[in-house]
Amino acid sequence: MLFPTEFDVIVVGGGHAGTEAALASARMGAKTLLLTHNIETLGQMSCNPSIGGIGKGHLVKEVDALGGAMAAATDESGIQFRILNSSKGPAVRATRAQADRILYKAAIRHRLENQPNLWLFQQAVDDLMVEGDRVVGAVTQIGIRFRARAVVLTAGTFLDGKIHVGLNNYTGGRAGDPAAVSLSSRLKELKLPQGRLKTGTPPRIDGRTIDFSKLDEQPGDLDPIPVFSFLGRADQHPQQLPCWVTHTNERTHDIIRGGLDRSPMYTGVIEGVGPRYCPSIEDKIHRFASKESHQIFLEPEGLTTHEFYPNGISTSLPFDVQLELVHSMRGLENAHILRPGYAIEYDYFDPRALKASLETKAINGLFFAGQINGTTGYEEAAAQGLLAGLNAGRYVQEKDAWCPRRDQAYLGVLVDDLVTRGVAEPYRMFTSRAEYRLSLREDNADMRLTEIGRELGLVDDARWDAFSRKRDAVSRETERLKSTWVTPKTLPVEEATALLGKAIDHEYSLAELLRRPGVSYDGVCGLKGGECGPAEPLADDPVLLEQIKEQVEIGIKYQGYIERQASEIERNDANENTRLPDGIDYREVRGLSFEVSQKLNEFRPETIGQASRISGVTPAAISLLMVHLKRRGLGRRNGTAAEAAEQGDGAVPTQQ
């Protein structure tokens, strides 16, 4: 067999965005090439050894519902699992896992090496091949030219990356890896709008030099141990380990303040903006000067290493200051640092220059995903990667792009925020960013997206069969609870009092009882000596059984709220998905201010919904725009219901 140099899709970069992009494109049936500077670092967790969290866990569940790899890889490598906000409402509950770095990489690589239609090749990319307004391939550092109809660029922090430790700095994509300087220069030649951002990582500590007797232990959830994937099982997890907690103190803060004159952040050496919600320890001490202590989590890096990740002290201070501040904390008085912390500056490109499909507006067939779009976090990268890979595959197949809506997925919220609002700092997902978060829960990500994923070609038979069984079981059990009744005569007073606090005074369905505060699904099913439970088990697998029960309980308890949110979505839908013509000149829209028309002409929103979320575009301006479209007969809805069903709900035409 000759060495292949022609592909449908090329993915550049093998991080969390690149691996999901390559897998998605290949699952679509596109002949896909993944180019990485080092095959050994495929799926590498460059910073913290954890997956998930508030908002982030929602994205991981959505990637999983669409057939992605991150959740399943976490189940196979997770050494601690926790449900965050477990005492709060279902909208904000989130799964978080500590992962063994080596096992996680192995799980991702196994999937890549066994994915049909996917080729791997180790070479850094120095150039993109562009003909006119189209990308046609990529050129590696030794001059190999690979041609393709679509390219997905997932360069992470590698584009002209510069690493800072104190006032020393050097080029690098991350510690131990070279920066992509030539590729960065080439992208700048293409006149794509770009800027600089910054992120950082803490020093790593040898666990053998930590005095754990002085620390507070933080175990994971053990009964039961959570799973991330909808197909996951708790017996997939390796050995579980605790995390540990220490704190900074006034001496720590004094040490940090004393080192600020050699901090690249506070001496103007670093120009890029860092992440607001994952600040360096220098920023914490400066911004929260009155706070006497900050909590620091010591997280194990894996089962076969003594290395610990001190979550909360990301820093670019000089190494001697890092050593002193670590030794100032309880339990770390004699700690040995294995790797220094550092900050890294890198190029990103203004995501407002992207379509909602993550294809660049300027160059057809070129897609961006991950930190190149101004986001931070493994989960945000993976979600974008899956979407970009999917749409690159659909692009070469001459099919319409799939662009999830804000009311459909956190992925839709993420992309819409990026392409309409841009970023002034690294973007991180939170549940607070989603206006329809009661409908966008972790637990129902498969109910929202797996059917769409099946239509798009992302979901295999095994996942589809498991989902279908779950969906049907939830539907049957919900209907059973609605149609099963108890009366004062059939429900013993003592049972009613134990469950409800008092006897019932008239006939109730089991669903009506379940809606009451403090009443659980198991409590209702246990009435009348268990006679109110299902005649047959809902599922044999205990994880699936809990998922079904959770879906049934939430669906019934929150039915009224969910229906009201659905009505709100329907009211907003008319304008949200009205498409804007590609060639419209907003200066011709009567009544629009110069500022608004200038912004609309600059950012070229694809829909009325996107236009309404651009900073400075007022509701009055949207009304004028709607009148203009109606007068000219230009506005059109985003496809019929039948088309949406055929394309996967939320499809928009690809401009080719």
UniProtKB/Swiss-Prot annotation:
NAD(+) binds at residues 274-288. Its main location: cytoplasm. Its cofactor is FAD. It is found in: Cytoplasm. FAD binds at residues 13-18. GO terms for molecular function: flavin adenine dinucleotide binding. The keyword Cell division does not apply. It holds the Pfam family GIDA_C_1st. One of its GO terms (biological process) is tRNA methylation. Homodimer. Heterotetramer of two MnmE and two MnmG subunits. NAD-binding protein involved in the addition of a carboxymethylaminomethyl (cmnm) group at the wobble position (U34) of certain tRNAs, forming tRNA-cmnm(5)s(2)U34. Belongs to the MnmG family. This is tRNA uridine 5-carboxymethylaminomethyl modification enzyme MnmG. It comes from Burkholderia cenocepacia (strain HI2424).
